[in-house]
Amino acid sequence: MGTLTVITGPSGVGKGTLVQRLLARNPSIWVSVSATTRAPREGEREGESYFFHSRERFDALVQEGGLLEWAEFAGNCYGTPRAPVEQQLQAGRPVLLEIELEGARQVRRSFSKARQIFLAPPSFEELERRIRGRGTDSEDAIQQRLLRAREELSAQGEFDAVVVNDDLDQALLKLEGLMGLG
């Protein structure tokens, strides 16, 4: 039986970058592909970027228990299909879910043995600097991200471990150790 690891943390903390580095060094890790009701963006491919579903199909998956976790953001739904995760775990592979806080809480309820890791910034000020440094969000969007980040940071005590991402290489080594890969 494989192991299930959940990683969450606020926007701008470096989850995506850290997961990319983790996968480059550990190709045996399987990362779940999310389902969504939003329309595909240019270059996105079915089954690789997301599984694109109608709202009706997504709602049916929720009702059937076909999603490990799901949430709605900005009018679109996102979730983690249950069957592929269970198949990979049965095959003995390490499985990684990079999801939002509420999704991590949902997974905890259905997979109590999942290792839950919270990725934290070295400080709130550094997190704000990173979010502003992207240069992609309006001031209103930045304020929304920061408000949400405060809520998420207050929940880090719910997790099995907290990894502070102030040095990418050190954070990567700590994450590998927590996942039993180091």
UniProtKB/Swiss-Prot annotation:
Protein name as annotated: Guanylate kinase
Pfam families: Guanylate_kin
Pathway(s) annotated for this protein in UniProt: Purine metabolism
Reaction catalyzed: GMP + ATP = GDP + ADP; dZMP + ATP = dZDP + ADP
Function: Essential for recycling GMP and indirectly, cGMP. (Microbial infection) Catalyzes the phosphorylation of dZMP to dZDP, when the bacterium is infected by a phage that produces the substrate for the synthesis of dZTP (2- amino-2'-deoxyadenosine 5'-triphosphate), which is then used by the phage as a DNA polymerase substrate.
Location relative to the cell: Cytoplasm
Membrane-crossing segments per the record: none
Keywords from the UniProt entry: ATP-binding, Cytoplasm, Kinase, Nucleotide-binding, Transferase
InterPro entries: GK/Ca_channel_bsu, Guanylate_kin-like_dom, Guanylate_kinase, Guanylate_kinase_CS, P-loop_NTPase
Gene that encodes the chain: gmk
Keyword presence, ATP-binding: yes
GO molecular function: ATP binding; guanylate kinase activity
Organism annotation: Parasynechococcus marenigrum (strain WH8102)
CDD domains in alphabetical order: GMPK
Coiled coil: none
Signal peptide start and end residues: none
Record has Oxidoreductase as a keyword: no
